[in-house]
Design a protein with these regions (language model features):
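Structural core segment of the AMP-binding/adenylate-forming
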Residues: 8-9, 45-46, 73-142
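Conserved AMP-binding A3 loop
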Residues: 28-30, 161-180
């Protein structure tokens, strides 16, 4: 079973049912699946290939849920970044994971000024917020709006879906792998 199977099953069983409701934005499972599919397609358009790492630095929201499903849908590996990390730790997680794309919300956009020159593998930064993205970032909504739907990539249940970092109590944080 792949992570995308959860969304596909929800659309089959209750497509018109509520999938998410956050700060006045509501969507049913059919709408949610459409956005997840198009975000996955948009990530592929940025060059994300199976196994590529896509990091997420944002607070919980309906959009976080979208990219939690869209990254493995695209064949990528999601790397959630702890929102309480200091800039040097964020740099370590991004570089150690080899993240090529970073999805970042308004709450953390300012931290990029402190870390930008230290990121080794990052190619694209996607602003997940309302309004125009800061300079040098792509718009999350434009990425979705400009992409066509796509079927989930058949990566197989034993393929890597996520990379979660430990607390680092015995040294630097280490990535722990989660398969589909």
């Amino acid at each position: 079973m792949r992570i995308s199977s959860i969304v596909n099953r929800a659309t089959q069983v209750n497509g018109a049912g509520l999938a998410s409701n956050f700060q006045g934005r509501s969507q049913n499972w059919n709408q949610f699946a459409n956005r997840v599919s198009r975000l996955a397609s948009g990530l592929c358009g940025l060059g994300v290939k199976p196994g590529d790492r896509v990091a997420m630095l944002s607070l919980n929201s309906d959009r976080y849920l979208e990219y939690f499903f869209a990254v493995p849908w695209s064949g990528g590996v999601f790397v959630p970044i702890n929102t309480r990390l200091a800039p040097p730790e964020i740099v370590h997680w991004l570089n150690d994971s080899g993240a090529s794309v970073l999805l970042i919300d308004d709450n953390f956009a300012a931290v990029l000024d402190k870390i930008q020159g230290q990121l080794e593998s990052l190619k694209s930064i996607v602003h997940v917020g309302d309004g125009a993205p800061p300079e040098g970032m792509l718009s999350y909504e434009a990425l979705i709006d400009g992409a066509a739907e796509m079927a989930p990539l058949d990566t197989g249940g034993d393929q890597l879906a996520g990379l979660f970092y430990t607390g680092g109590t015995t040294g630097r944080s280490k990535g722990v792998m989660l398969s589909h």
